[in-house]
């Protein structure tokens, strides 16, 4: 069983996201420890990028703050090395294809393998172009995690059949951010996914409250939350890890029902 599969093995998974380096890497490390200690099953780590096209204003702001603080891909790798001394849950990078290309794809993925990164999400990588990275990901044992947005049944089935790690189901078209209600027929998407793969699926984009998380976990195998955590960092700065830990605990309790 892959490390990512273990995140879903004990029941519904809660998956928080954080942008590395916002407001600084020391705070990111403390937040990762707080999330892991309070029940996060898997953590998505954003490597900051100057043009994060999938993100709404909250996570765009986090990217900008992290870059202004001097965060680089190498510094993020060092951060993961440090937290991996005692954080055993799966860690997945979420970044953009350009970050991987500019670093050198093989160098990037070999470093991921060395420091204990379990998966990679590239929101700007179309399914049709995933073979640019898939062979290297397989070579280094890093799951290339696909995203499924509301689309045709045939396309959902096609993406699901080749899924690795887990499937990231996008709750609605558009950018990340918190939403008051989610209108997409997610149950229909999950049904098609489950007919085509045993790989678990989690829903993200727009989830912020325990009620929303519980509802999404009722439909899929887990819930993903990013913007709500970034807002805590925006509000509390270096004091945010304690608040983030308490928030993750509430969300995990909701997901497990």
Regions found by a protein language model. Give the residues of each.
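Alpha/beta catalytic cores of nucleotide-metabolism and tRNA/nucleoside-modifying enzymes
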Residues: 76, 191-199, 208-257
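N-terminal amphipathic alpha-helix/helix-capping segment at the start of soluble metabolic enzymes
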Residues: 1-18, 80-85, 256
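Glycine-rich beta-to-alpha transition loops that act as phosphate-gripper elements at the mouths
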Residues: 19-24, 94-102, 126-127, 147-151, ...
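Catalytic cores of alpha/beta
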Residues: 25-35, 151-161, 203, 207-223
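Active-site-adjacent beta->alpha loops and helix N-cap segments on the catalytic face
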Residues: 1-7, 50-59, 71-81, 101-107, ...
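Active-site beta->alpha loop and helix N-cap motifs at the rims of alpha/beta catalytic domains
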Residues: 47, 60-122, 255
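Glycine-rich phosphate-binding active-site loops on the catalytic face of alpha/beta enzymes
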Residues: 40-51, 117-121, 126, 171-177, ...
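Hydrophobic faces of well-ordered beta-strands that scaffold small-molecule active sites
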Residues: 14-18, 43-45, 91-95, 120-122, ...
């Amino acid at each position: 069983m892959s490390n990512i599969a273990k995140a879903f093995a004990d029941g519904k998974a809660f998956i928080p996201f954080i942008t590395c380096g916002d407001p600084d890497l020391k705070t990111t490390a403390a937040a990762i420890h707080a999330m892991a200690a309070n029940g996060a099953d898997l953590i998505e780590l954003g490597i900051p990028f100057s043009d994060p096209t999938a993100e709404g204003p909250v996570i765009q702001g986090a990217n900008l703050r992290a870059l202004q603080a001097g965060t680089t891909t190498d510094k993020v790798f060092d951060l993961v090395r440090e937290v991996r001394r005692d954080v055993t849950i799966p860690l997945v990078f979420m970044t953009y294809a350009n970050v991987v290309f500019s670093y050198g794809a093989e160098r990037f993925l070999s470093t991921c393998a060395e420091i204990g990164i379990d998966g990679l999400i590239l929101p700007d990588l179309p399914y049709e172009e995933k073979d640019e990275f898939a062979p290297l990901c397989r070579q280094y044992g890093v799951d290339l995690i696909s995203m499924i947005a509301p689309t045709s049944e045939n396309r959902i089935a096609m993406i699901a059949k080749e899924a690795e790690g887990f499937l990231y189901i996008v709750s609605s078209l558009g950018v990340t951010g918190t939403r008051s209600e989610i209108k997409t027929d997610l149950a229909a998407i999950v049904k098609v996914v489950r007919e085509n793969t045993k790989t678990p699926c989690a829903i993200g984009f727009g989830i912020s409250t325990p009620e929303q998380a519980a509802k999404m976990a009722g439909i899929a195998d887990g819930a993903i939350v990013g913007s709500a955590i970034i807002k805590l960092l925006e509000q509390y700065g270096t004091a945010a890890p304690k608040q983030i830990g308490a928030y993750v605990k509430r969300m995990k309790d909701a997901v497990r029902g």
